Amino acid sequence: RIGTSTDVPAGAIETTGALNYLGRAAEYDYNAWWFCSFPTDAVKEVGLPLPLFIHGDDIEYGIRLNSYGYKVFCPGGISVWHESFENKHLTWIRYFDFRNALIRLALHFDNPPKIIIRQLKHVCQRALIRNDYGAYIMAVKAFEDFCKGPEILSLTNFSEQIKSLDDLYHEYSKVDSSGRYKLSNEELSCQKEKKIKTAMRYLTANLHSIPIPSIRHFRTSNTRFSWTDVPYFSDITVDLANGNQIHYRRNLKKYRSLNKRLRI
């Protein structure tokens, strides 16, 4: 099957029309730098990409091109292989993902304060449900720096900045490569649930405010597992391709500490 957002049916590639789909030149809102194309005259009119250092600069540029009436195409037959995103454990880079998303929202959308606050709450809520307190603090740090203004983009000491962000992330979320996680309670995999239960999970951050310790163990090999898969009162283990594990343990003390830092 070609992706989850296409209408190409599952089946043998020569019988489903997938070859025609892969070979077409498709129009999109943006493309990653390594396979996008646009007129050179467009650069003269809309200017150069923003100095965002990493992640999201291609998204902003695609949106900017579209706002000037330039189309962005993905030429068929061009691809670059890289490691699956499912096997990548995202730490400090979450800061740049969210900070640059805030910049993009401020530049290209109406009523940006309302949208930005909503996005911040959404990102933090999902991080809490996943017990990923490091991702939460990256979003808060990104928001704080965004509020300081465009001067933050003039920083060039990237090595120091990344080390500081990485230390901050691991202060809240740690990777354990020394052994296997031990928990006597039941181990659960992904299960479908009713929409009302999913809504309750989101609104209460998976019942984080209730002072009950972990009673379940959710395990997956996908580093980008969905917050909707996590059962109530669960510790989480992610098995990495290299044999290491990531443990996201439910921690009410960290939850309360982070909530105090972010008051909206």
Predicted ranges, named:
Residues 38:
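A conserved hydrophobic position in a structured secondary element of the catalytic/binding core
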Residues 48-51, 63, 67-68, 91-111, ...:
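Catalytic-core region of carbohydrate-active enzymes that cleave or remodel glycosidic bonds
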Residues 30-35, 44-63, 69-75:
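Donor nucleotide-sugar recognition loop
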Residues 99-264:
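Terminal low-complexity segments of carbohydrate-biosynthetic enzymes
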Residues 7-35:
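A recurrent flexible, glycine/aromatic-enriched loop bordering the glycosyltransferase active site
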Residues 52, 87-94, 126-133:
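Hydrophobic alpha-helical scaffolding
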Residues 1-7:
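Conserved donor NDP-sugar-binding/catalytic core segment of glycosyltransferases
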Residues 75-91:
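Active-site donor/metal-binding and catalytic loop motifs
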